[in-house]
Amino acid sequence: MERIKELRDLMSQSRTREILTKTTVDHMAIIKKYTSGRQEKNPALRMKWMMAMKYPITADKRIIEMIPERNEQGQTLWSKTNDAGSDRVMVSPLAVTWWNRNGPTTSAVHYPKVYKTYFEKVERLKHGTFGPVHFRNQVKIRRRVDINPGHADLSAKEAQDVIMEVVFPNEVGARILTSESQLTITKEKKEELQDCKIAPLMVAYMLERELVRKTRFLPVAGGTSSVYIEVLHLTQGTCWEQMYTPGGEVRNDDVDQSLIIAARNIVRRATVSADPLASLLEMCHSTQIGGIRMVDILRQNPTEEQAVDICKAAMGLRISSSFSFGGFTFKRTSGSSVKKEEEVLTGNLQTLKIRVHEGYEEFTMVGRRATAILRKATRRLIQLIVSGRDEQSIAEAIIVAMVFSQEDCMIKAVRGDLNFVNRANQRLNPMHQLLRHFQKDAKVLFQNWGIEPIDNVMGMIGILPDMTPSTEMSLRGVRVSKMGVDEYSSTERVVVSIDRFLRVRDQRGNVLLSPEEVSETQGTEKLTITYSSSMMWEINGPESVLVNTYQWIIRNWETVKIQWSQDPTMLYNKMEFEPFQSLVPKAARGQYSGFVRTLFQQMRDVLGTFDTVQIIKLLPFAAAPPEQSRMQFSSLTVNVRGSGMRILVRGNSPVFNYNKATKRLTVLGKDAGALTEDPDEGTAGVESAVLRGFLILGKEDKRYGPALSINELSNLAKGEKANVLIGQGDVVLVMKRKRDSSILTDSQTATKRIRMAIN
């Protein structure tokens, strides 16, 4: 108070006022503070001070020719004095008004293109429907959400290169546009923005909105896709929510949704193959989502979901350090533990080997419909605070936490044997056995857990074993809260390793993810997912497997044929025949395979019995491990259309029909492609007959000496190579076969291989 009085007295003296208004500020520190750097230090003051002046704006000299000196009201629009320190003119705010009303107009054609994201937002809001407002407590939890709908998924660096190339094509600086999406976008935008008069900087800002995903950590109670987040301020408050249905979808949300579905399908399929990791990688690399390669999407898309993260880990990408159990994402917030193997007995006296976490730890658990804070010690749950959308969701979270706590009373609550298996028919690990058991029925678990009286704490209530709320009693250590638990905010990613069974571990060896954690929820993808891998043929059912298998053989017939005669075992082991096995009755697989392999060997041994159509028809049956038996078959059964259908060994059937006239194959009435047979098959030329017993390796190789005549060949030892002069003076490199059994086939492949070697 004293100080203020003193200042008032000082200000009443005219001398003080004069000093303050006339004296220059010459203290270096102050000058530095307000003038260093381009950042305005006091924007509000600056704005007030500028607008109080008559001509606060500077403009290019050319403006004088374009704007009159005075407007209709006779107010001056620009000053004749130049701006100090530049060759621009000083202009009044009134000049802006005049320009907006009377200035030149330009074509508006580029506006919707540059401000695309805004125009699209208006459309979505116009067609969206807002429902009633409900007043209720909102359980919001902070999640990392996408805040700009309609963006591509380029990294900041990739987008920067595209923007520079589109907006400032003549600027120097190395720009490398490598990814497919970069090139497509650049081409498209250059065409759209030809002769665009909008300020380049503005165009650059708008392009950034279109190309890069922007995320924020926001409290959300409902939908998290970007078309809901853009209206977050309209749909939920502290105590109210308004129903809203978006008036349109955006590609980025569709990509996220389709990516999750593709990843889940791929992980589920990989789990049941002989080498899950190799299969998973093969499928990720051969799958496209909405016409873009899945691996490109995985590299750019930050979606965190169990299956997506397993695919990322397999590709060597970093993922979040949190781990998944029972569909909840766990993040340790404090404490530490060491793991020890321990044997425990269930209520059914079954022995389980579990890895016990010894030590005090605190975790946050975040699921789709419930969240919780868990404090635990060695095999003991100390406290669990849950919040969720409904009774069911809360129960799910409690079960997961109880199992995770590894408490003895939970293990003793097991009734019956634990023998859950995964899709590949392998037993689940003990922790997942327990989880599945109680997810099926948790009555005994809740009854045996024990209850305790509770204190009255604001915002918290108790929950009884039958999952009803109570203010007096609660399950031991468990409370239900009105407040949600925020998702883990950090976007930090860690290096992980993955084993061939798709278990993902951090560098300390903790398991973060495994295929058991992948949701079984089925959904319909918004964008077309194209799985080129043979492993995904079965996703559309048995018929698709049948058609795809035969299409594959026909497409690759040239190489299949050579392998059929020279390295059949390698051919039989091709993964493309794996899906087909599920169509062959289990009991018959081995017998069919043995029969077909014997038949093929006879074809190889007896010249002239090479029957293309029959080889194609029977080849998939030879892929199963063969049983040696003398059985002969005239037809082979496949299970399609809900029953066994027959494929005739000799002749056509509804399943496999080859039309000699059109040379086309139909499988179950669907076209499977055309056969291009060698015209000289069966009447192979003299060279091929003479070269029987030799493998043609390719063009002449000078290291093996001068060319021999065909007659001199007989002196070669088995496995020896030589150049040979054939037919029209061409020279090819051959090797004498090590085995005699395959001699007869050479004449079929020789003609073609000679042709290939010469060309």
Curated annotation (Swiss-Prot):
Species lineage, top-down? Viruses, Riboviria, Orthornavirae, Negarnaviricota, Polyploviricotina
Q: What is this protein called?
A: Polymerase basic protein 2
Q: Which GO terms describe its cellular component?
A: host cell nucleus; virion component
According to the UniProt entry, its GO molecular function terms are:
RNA binding; RNA-directed RNA polymerase activity
The family annotation for this protein states: Belongs to the influenza viruses PB2 family.
What residues does the record give for site: Avian adaptation? 627
Q: Which organism is it from?
A: Influenza A virus (strain A/Chicken/Hong Kong/YU22/2002 H5N1 genotype Z)
Location relative to the cell? Virion; Host nucleus
- List the residue ranges forming a coiled coil, or say none: none
Question: What does the function comment of this entry state?
Answer: Plays an essential role in transcription initiation and cap-stealing mechanism, in which cellular capped pre-mRNAs are used to generate primers for viral transcription. Recognizes and binds the 7-methylguanosine-containing cap of the target pre-RNA which is subsequently cleaved after 10-13 nucleotides by the viral protein PA. Plays a role in the initiation of the viral genome replication and modulates the activity of the ribonucleoprotein (RNP) complex.
- How does it associate, per the subunit comment? Influenza RNA polymerase is composed of three subunits: PB1, PB2 and PA. Interacts (via N-terminus) with PB1 (via C-terminus). Interacts with nucleoprotein NP (via N-terminus).
Gene that produces this protein? PB2
